[in-house]
């Protein structure tokens, strides 16, 4: 029997979150219906800027625009596919991305071009990181790093941690900056070369010591804010 409704996490117009039930969109010829096993909370979007938005909504509710489903990265098993889908099949493990599609939901309808097969060795939990991992990978590619260079990652949230790990795998020496010492310690456990908790130390001096005075070859800004808005 076809599934017609699902449950999804949504922002409400009162500055909060709620689990709501809504109709699933019809399955188009290029769509994939996924039974979601894991979805990833993006701290910068949903807990950073997201909480600011929640406060605005609490102070100025807009009932006609709420509730608003959230989430953009999940993983699960394909339940059904549209007539023209060729990349994945029913029963296959997949990861999905895309705001408005790969939501925090029980089921999700996602366009085929936003769905990728998951290797057997990759867990659903790891697969749900696909969107943020792709963001980090794009940042590393844009730096055009070379072996032996010095890199800095400014901000050690999820994207920053993933970026630092990928830079290390690319053969660079990496220092990470963050306001929170706990994030620096996490990066150190992940194998980063050096960190600086900028609330306790001067990051410029720390970076000069790290590079032996040579300076940085590249840097990735992995923090939310107007300076990083495209």
Please identify what each model-predicted range represents:
Residues 25-41, 49, 53-100:
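Glycine-rich beta-strand-centered segment in the early N-terminal region that forms part
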Residues 38, 73, 92-93, 107, ...:
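Residue-level marker of beta-strand positions
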Residues 43, 98-112:
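A structural motif shared across PLP-dependent enzymes of the aminotransferase-like
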Residues 94, 150-153, 219-220:
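Conserved hydrophobic beta-strands of the Rossmann-like cofactor-binding core
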Residues 104, 161-162, 228-230:
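Glycine/Thr-rich phosphate-binding loops of Rossmann-like dinucleotide-binding domains
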Residues 106-120, 171-172:
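Short, compositionally biased
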Residues 125-200, 205:
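Mid-domain Rossmann-like dinucleotide-binding core that forms the NAD(H)/NADP(H) cofactor-binding site
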Residues 193-230:
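Glycine-rich cofactor phosphate-binding loops and adjacent beta1-alpha1 units
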């Amino acid at each position: 029997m076809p599934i017609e409704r699902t449950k999804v996490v949504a922002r409400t117009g009162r500055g909060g979150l709620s689990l709501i039930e809504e109709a699933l969109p019809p399955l188009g010829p290029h769509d994939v219906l996924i039974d979601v096993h894991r979805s990833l909370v993006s701290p910068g979007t949903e807990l950073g800027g997201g909480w600011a938005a929640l406060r605005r909504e609490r102070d100025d509710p807009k009932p006609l625009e709420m509730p608003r489903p959230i989430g953009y990265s999940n993983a699960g098993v394909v339940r059904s596919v549209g007539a023209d889908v060729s990349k994945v099949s029913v029963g296959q493990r997949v990861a999905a991305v895309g705001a408005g599609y790969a939501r925090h939901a029980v089921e999700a309808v996602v366009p085929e071009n936003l769905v990728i097969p998951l290797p057997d060795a990759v867990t659903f939990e790891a697969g749900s990181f696909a969107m943020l991992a792709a963001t980090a990978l794009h940042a590393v590619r844009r730096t055009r790093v070379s072996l032996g260079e010095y890199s800095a990652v400014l901000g050690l949230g999820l994207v920053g941690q993933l970026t630092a790990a990928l830079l290390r795998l690319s053969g660079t020496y990496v220092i990470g900056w963050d306001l929170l010492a706990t994030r620096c310690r996490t990066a150190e456990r992940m194998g980063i070369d050096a960190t600086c908790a900028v609330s306790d130390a001067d990051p410029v001096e720390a970076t000069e010591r790290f590079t032996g005075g040579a300076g940085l070859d590249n840097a990735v800004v992995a923090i939310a804010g107007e300076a990083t808005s495209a």
